[in-house]
Amino acid sequence: MSEAVRIGDIVFLAGQIPDDLAGDIAAQTREVLDNVDAVMAELGGSKADIASIQVWLSDMADFQGMNAVWDAWVDPANPPARATCGVALARPGMRVEMIAVARAPY
């Protein structure tokens, strides 16, 4: 499975998930956002190129914990659009997954 696919000037990042499922929501969110940063860097871009992110939480009670890590990560001068939903995630212990759409770095 591809980590990201470029179509023209748009990049679609696949679902970014934590590897360490023992961590709390803050640890899992940091790991996922680090993954987003790493994929964008591989493409020659950064979080400044991200247009939108969908955040999926296995428990909406984790919203504030995820959001605190998000607020520390996001550039307040250039925040992407974001939607957050409660869903059933693929693996037990997984608390967060994110997908993103970005402009392709030039």
Report each predicted region and the residues it spans.
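Short, polar/acidic, helix-capping and beta-turn segments at strand->helix junctions
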Residues: 1-106
